[in-house]
């Protein structure tokens, strides 16, 4: 299915192979708090480095090869990231309103024209994987401590129909 939208005189096509996954405020807050606790960095520094928001998920493994065709669509989505594997899980969680969370360890900026060199990625991952896992676990602990107070209008109850 393809839908067409006119934005500022431009016609933009949206295919079923792309799905915008919005962020959940409670998870964003838990990730921010966990990042401050684990990294020991002050709040202003965390705000400069931590990115939370809408993630675009796609089943098109070659989207980067047709960047100009996808760029307008991605820019209009206001997405902070484009992901395939973890965002696919998040898309289904959003679709069926099942709570989900995704913590991405990003080593490159594919849309910024940087070359992806193996040595650079390896150095990044050596230092970042442990910290990212600690942040994820701490965020889950913070969310668990909230218990019944957690609420998001983006979530459905189990007996509510998934599509309306």
Tell where the protein language model's regions lie, with residue ranges.
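Glycine-rich phosphate- or other oxyanion-binding loops that anchor nucleotides, phosphorylated ligands
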Residues: 1-164
